[in-house]
Amino acid sequence: VAEDITARKDELGFAAFTSAGMDSSSDWRFKTHLANLPIYFEYQADGIGSTDAIKGTYLDNYKNMFDLYINNSTCAPTELAGKTGDDSRNEFLNNEAVFYQNGSWEYTNLVGDGKPFTDDDLTMLPIYIGVGDEANQGLCTGTENYWCVNGTAKQEDIDATLAFMNWVITSDEGRKSMSQDMGFVAPFDTFTGEYQSANPFVQIAAQYPAEGKTPVSWNFATIPSEEWKNGVG
């Protein structure tokens, strides 16, 4: 599909992919999120959840996908070093490309407040790199963030923090703020009915496992270092 779009780019007036910029505001999408896919499938093949040394079993698959991005893009590969995250987003907003790699957190930058898209204009697709059971593959799903309480703080501060965290996920105001106003993924059993996220990307992510498809877990915590990621990038 991407290569067909490129072959007809002048006729269609748009490209397949937004620019895969290697500026620091953009490169995390590829040296972390896209790079997670070959790591995930390597772990799946080896039956592990972490390793002391990533073998790179599926690095060729990763390279093929990235080559698809940069050779079917809004710009020439030689221009990518200076392309930013804003450039990529704006290309998508201006209907210059069909595909834009990003996550559910990007929703509010694309819909509402004068943005050109409605919920019906957008969807999310798994990234298939030619490995595993693609017919039953879901979206890449995970988090790098956790709620923590400082165990060395005063007990009164610990209690107040825990009370606030409980309020956020149980009160009407807290739940509405998280799921509706901010559009966050809220993986708590208190977020049912009207408190389910209004973010359609979150709903799509939930739909895949409901249909029996397996999410691709985030394995970022096992990536050796930022230097390793920079080498990949």
Model regions and ranges:
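Extracytoplasmic/periplasmic solute-binding protein
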Residues: 2-51, 97
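C-terminal capping/gating helix-and-loop segments adjacent to ligand/active sites or protein-protein/ligand interfaces
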Residues: 141, 190, 203-233
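Extracytoplasmic/periplasmic substrate-recognition and gating elements
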Residues: 74, 113-181
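Glycine-centered hinge/linker elements that transmit conformational signals in sensory
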Residues: 48-82
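Beta->alpha turn/N-cap motifs
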Residues: 85, 102-107, 143-145
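Short helix-initiation/N-cap motifs at beta->coil->alpha
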Residues: 79-94
